[in-house]
């Protein structure tokens, strides 16, 4: 390296160092850099800020400047893919592939869906929270009063009774 090349190299190096010290935000100790600021490191989740991208993340593409996810995966939704989509239930914050399961309202072998939302209330018990008109039960598996049919069979539904007030709810 001759004197001129060496001078140019040192000048460039000094410029990079000055730029880094003047413009860059440096985080120290137990902090993590996120969107131009430093925040306490909390492991895989920055609580209230972002679900960090990991190998098992539910976010496929994150907006670099805002940190908002533009491509939620595995039936998730939300700015950080922290919720299950309508029609699915589970804990999306776990970030695994099958964390959000399809609601069974009543679902199963009938394939029928009569609620677009459900939630996990007790261990292993899913409750459908918005049964369509004419359907009732924890899985929308029964016809409501004034309706008849069998929602548990494939293609089954509940139809409004047109019985002029002559209803035998036992049949």
Swiss-Prot record:
Q: Where is the signal peptide?
A: 1-29
Coiled coil segments of this chain: none
Keyword Oxidoreductase part of the UniProt annotation: no
GO CC, any one term: basement membrane
Secreted in keyword set = yes
The UniProt entry lists the main location of this chain as secreted
Q: What does this protein do?
A: Binding to cells via a high affinity receptor, laminin is thought to mediate the attachment, migration and organization of cells into tissues during embryonic development by interacting with other extracellular matrix components.
Q: Which UniProt keywords apply?
A: Basement membrane, Cell adhesion, Disulfide bond, Extracellular matrix, Glycoprotein, Laminin EGF-like domain, Repeat, Secreted, Signal
Q: Which SMART domains match?
A: EGF_Lam (SM00180)
Q: Which residues are glycosylated?
A: 130
Q: Which domain of life is it from?
A: Eukaryota
Its localization reads: Secreted, Extracellular space, Extracellular matrix, Basement membrane
Disulphide connectivity of cysteines: 59-69, 72-81, 84-100, 103-118, 105-128, 131-140, 143-158
Where does the Laminin EGF-like domain start and stop, copy by copy?
Answer: 66-102, 103-160, 161-171
- Subunit note: Laminin is a complex glycoprotein, consisting of three different polypeptide chains (alpha, beta, gamma), which are bound to each other by disulfide bonds into a cross-shaped molecule comprising one long and three short arms with globules at each end.
Q: Can you say what this protein is called?
A: Laminin subunit beta-1
| Gene Ontology BP terms | animal organ morphogenesis; cell adhesion; tissue development
